[in-house]
Amino acid sequence: MSPADTARPQLKIRSVALDTGRENVVVISRRSRALRPEVFSGFSRVELRCNSRTLLATLLITDDDALVGPDEIGLSEPALRRFAEPAGMLATVSPATPPESLEAVRAKIRGETLSDEAIAAVIEDLAHYRYSDMEIAAFLIGSASFMTSGELLALTHAMANAGTQLTWPEPVVVDKHCIGGIPGNRTSMVVVPIVAAHGLTIPKTSSRAITSPAGTADTMEVLARVNVGAEEMKSIVAACNGCVIWGGHVNLSPADDILISVERPLSLDTREQMVASILSKKLAAGSTHLLLDLPVGPTAKLTSGAEAMRLRKLFEFVGDRFGLKVEVITTDGRQPIGHGIGPVLEARDVMAVLGNEPQAPADLREKSLRLAAHLLEYDPKLRGGAGYSRARELLDSGAALKQMQKIIDAQGPSAGRSELGDLAFDVGAASDGVVSAIDCLRLNRLARTAGAPVNKGAGIRLYKKIGDRVDQGEPLYRVFTCDPSEHDLAAAAASANNGYVLDGPNGPH
């Protein structure tokens, strides 16, 4: 310890049960000898020191001695894990020196263009948890007003280099990604085994849901373990040609996960940030060829073809600069894909398609085949235009199902729930008519209100899609929940607006 540290009061580290998201938070008593009112106040940024370790954190002050005593300092779970010093050790707390890169954030807010070095410094500090959520929000808001093409390239590069970077022995490593927003749409879990069964390498790292009722990782977790590290991931891919795992456990572009955790509550979703987010992870994952699915629809993230075209050009521009072959396709985003919304229901859809079951959702099957066809065309040994027929052959023959089972076995069994919620209710049509529109955003919110994805058995089973005729009172869908309070909340939400528009004799209603 330095002489200054020796002079400061030492506090005993204590673990406190506080959910602070990703942010490092420490708690001290208002009666603590270390609390100097002229220096510290609630939400101050402080530096914690113990031996040679340091940690930047946000300070909370408590009057509850049961939480932390006057001679203790409480660390939230993320802070304790990152500090890597056990409870009971002695530490000092002092005012934190702000990261130098914060000057770049202030410059961006003033409307200045940042250098590559400035952006790299921001991402470096951000990835090492030196920023508070408020400081991250300042960077995001400053960047949302404008971002030059040079800044976008620098941001993508810095984010890709901030965490684990994977390499593969194969010359062609393919991947696919959908920008999201469409309920169901669990095509990756069908595409990966088709492509892997053909022999191409497809190491799929997926996200967990943030604002949707299920991410690919949440759905795969119904079937298999997804918390897989980088070395184990490489072993699985070597044995199976592919995997479907949670990217957060591999530490690909960790700064992106931090940015997303602050973006979503603020409803910040700029095109530049989306491109940097997606491509930084694909570059870090070692992909050489990427297929991007951009759904377009009235309640999708992209509402027009023109908007999709602008985003496509942005993806292609950045991909070209980093040597990543990016192919972008627009797809129908007017309604959900598949019968189910929520992890268990979506996993059942996937296995029904792979198993060629008669009741399998035809839209999920067809879209997955078309996406897989594009990826298979990257195989130089496959004749041009043969991708679709090869994908269908692998699916119809059962080869894709066999490959999926191989991937599931390699990743290991899941400890998650695989049963549907035992509380359910139907939502019926208010009148006779034909379904003319479905609000994807509202159904996503309803499934989350029902408990998904935290409760994997919660969700929605769809009975009707656009173009289907319904009679008054006929079920449009069934909502599954695992908790009585969530059941009541979901029932109230569905009663207020069921998300369906019907065309009848008197027009839409």
Curated annotation (Swiss-Prot):
It is an enzyme of class 2 (transferase). Its EC number is 2.4.2.4. GO terms for cellular component: cytosol. One of its GO terms (biological process) is pyrimidine nucleobase metabolic process. Transmembrane segments: none annotated. Keywords: Glycosyltransferase, Transferase. It comes from the Bacteria. GO terms for molecular function: 1,4-alpha-oligoglucan phosphorylase activity; thymidine phosphorylase activity. It catalyses: thymidine + phosphate = 2-deoxy-alpha-D-ribose 1-phosphate + thymine. Belongs to the thymidine/pyrimidine-nucleoside phosphorylase family. Type 2 subfamily. PANTHER family: THYMIDINE PHOSPHORYLASE. This is Putative thymidine phosphorylase.
